[in-house]
């Protein structure tokens, strides 16, 4: 029987982030979703069910305006001149439909304005277009004034050009020229910057990545931290993506758990951060790179175990 340790950790994190809330009242949580290259619908359902099952949380969901859903035309085989001509015409028509849709729904983004201040914790399950200035300011103000924030998996892929968000998450899925490459020093358990010359595995490009999904061991780096209570010092996570070479700054990053990224699974032969937290103003921000789920995936183990 699989042990639901990731769900236990998730609930513990949100409880600790909302420690100032009255013990008699449920902790109010808002999940942000609607755009993501992953299956954000089922990820949100899983997060919501996990929290509500504890009886400690009241969970609401705020979903971004819908994207243009019609898939792009399929590309023809190489050398198929007639197919290429038909594809070009179909793609041109598709682009016009997409443009017309976006124009018709441009005002939807102005109407999307979650009331962050009404909640103790925000769960970020969003990886899509950058928000408008007013929404970004409200989000920043929420965290600065003491709100809790939890970023799930691909949420740390987003908002590359938003300085406040980059400071909140410390490191994320970024290109090779962004910030510093972050790893975990196995001896100290601390986040460290790694120079390209010190990489143990040399590959083309040094931006963020991952190898094939596989099960891997999580190692506690701050077992005494309140967020880690009830979590073993080592535990086996189900098959998931093990992010490596995430980039940003280690300056105020506190690692809670890491995993060894093995070359056997396309990894770096270094310890990579899996769960970490940071202060931002009076708020606390927790980020986990775990929780991969594509649309159509039949296994939810990466979200549960």
Regions found by a protein language model. Name each.
Residues 24, 28-32, 39-159, 293-297:
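Helical hinge/lid and interdomain linker segments adjacent to catalytic or ligand-binding clefts
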Residues 34-37, 127, 204-206, 211-216, ...:
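Active-site rim elements
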Residues 279-285, 290, 305:
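Glycine-rich, aromatic-lined ligand/substrate-binding cores of catalytic
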Residues 12-22:
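Hydrophobic h-region of N-terminal signal peptides that target proteins for export
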Residues 52, 58, 105-108, 118, ...:
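Catalytic beta-strand/loop cores that center a nucleophilic Ser/Cys/Thr
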Residues 1-13:
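Bacterial N-terminal signal peptides that target proteins for export
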Residues 115, 121-124, 128-229:
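A glycine-rich, often tryptophan-bearing local segment used as a flexible ligand/cofactor-contacting loop or short
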Residues 148-150, 256, 286:
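Structural detector of well-ordered beta-strand residues that form the stable sheet scaffold
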């Amino acid at each position: 029987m699989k042990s639901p340790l990731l769900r236990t950790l998730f609930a513990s994190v949100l409880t600790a982030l909302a420690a100032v809330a009255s013990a008699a009242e449920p902790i109010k949580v808002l999940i942000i979703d609607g755009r993501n290259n992953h299956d954000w619908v089922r990820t949100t359902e899983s997060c919501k069910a996990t929290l509500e099952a504890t009886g400690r949380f009241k969970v609401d969901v705020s979903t971004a305006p819908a994207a243009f859903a019609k898939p792009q035309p399929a590309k023809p085989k190489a050398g198929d001149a007639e197919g290429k001509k038909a594809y070009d015409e179909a793609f041109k028509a598709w682009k016009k439909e997409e443009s017309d849709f976006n124009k018709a729904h441009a005002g939807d983004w102005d109407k999307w304005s979650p009331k962050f201040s009404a909640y103790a914790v925000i769960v970020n399950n969003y990886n899509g277009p950058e928000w408008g200035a007013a929404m970004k300011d409200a989000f920043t103000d929420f965290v600065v004034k003491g709100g809790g924030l939890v970023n799930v998996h691909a949420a740390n892929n987003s908002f590359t050009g938003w300085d406040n968000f980059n400071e909140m998450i410390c490191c994320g899925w970024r290109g090779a020229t962004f910030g510093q490459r972050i790893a975990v020093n196995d001896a100290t358990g601390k986040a460290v910057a790694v120079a390209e010359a010190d990489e143990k595995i040399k590959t083309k490009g040094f931006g963020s990545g991952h190898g094939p999904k596989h099960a891997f061991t999580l190692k506690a780096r701050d077992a005494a931290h309140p967020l880690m209570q009830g979590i073993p010092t080592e535990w086996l996570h189900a098959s998931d993506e093990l992010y490596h070479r995430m980039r940003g700054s280690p300056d105020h990053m506190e690692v809670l758990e890491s995993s060894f990224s093995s070359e056997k699974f396309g990894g770096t032969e270094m310890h990579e951060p899996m769960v970490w937290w940071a202060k931002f103003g009076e708020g606390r921000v927790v980020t986990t790179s775990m929780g991969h789920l594509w649309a159509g995936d039949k296994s939810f183990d990466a979200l549960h175990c």
